[in-house]
Regions:
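Conserved short histidine dyad/triad with adjacent acidic residue
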Residues: 39-54, 89
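Short beta-strand His + acidic residue motifs that chelate non-heme Fe in jelly-roll/DSBH
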Residues: 49-51, 69-70, 92-99
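Glycine- and acidic-residue-biased ligand/ion/polar-headgroup-sensing regions
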Residues: 55-67, 72-73
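Short acidic-glycine-tyrosine-enriched beta hairpin
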Residues: 73-90
Length: 129
């Protein structure tokens, strides 16, 4: 057992860029432990992840704002404060804020994350229709 109080001591917010579109900040909740990574992630309006998937899965818990999540081959779905999403192993997806609002979620990623290409603007904007 390990108790981690608050945020990781000495950890600073990290601006994410290489696998995100737009302004995204992440704050680690705990260091990666036994293949589990937990981050609080803040997305400015229009910001989103690249397409990606997780070896074992991911849980998203939206703590503020609203946004979209999209599983490959499906229409984007609205997610908002209080929503929880389970993304299964190998499910290719993206998630982020919508065009008008910020979104903050706690992301618990289990196993390796495989990052892929950016989400095209026309695919992202399908959610706004």
């Amino acid at each position: 057992m390990k108790v981690i109080h608050g945020s990781i001591e000495g950890a600073i917010s990290e601006q994410r860029g290489a696998t995100f579109t737009g302004v995204v900040w992440a704050d680690p909740v705990m260091p990666t432990t036994d293949g589990v990574t937990i981050n609080n992630v803040s997305f400015n309006p229009g910001a989103r992840t690249f397409w990606h998937f997780h070896e074992v899965g991911q849980v998203l818990y939206v703590t503020a704002g609203s946004g979209w999540i999209c599983l490959e081959g499906s229409e984007p779905q609205v997610i908002r404060q209080g929503d929880t999403v389970w993304i299964g192993p190998g499910e290719r997806h993206w998630h982020g804020a919508n065009t008008e609002n910020f979104m903050v979620h706690t992301a618990t990623s289990i196993g390796k994350t495989v990052w892929q290409e950016a989400v095209a603007d026309h695919d992202y904007l399908r959610a706004a229709r």
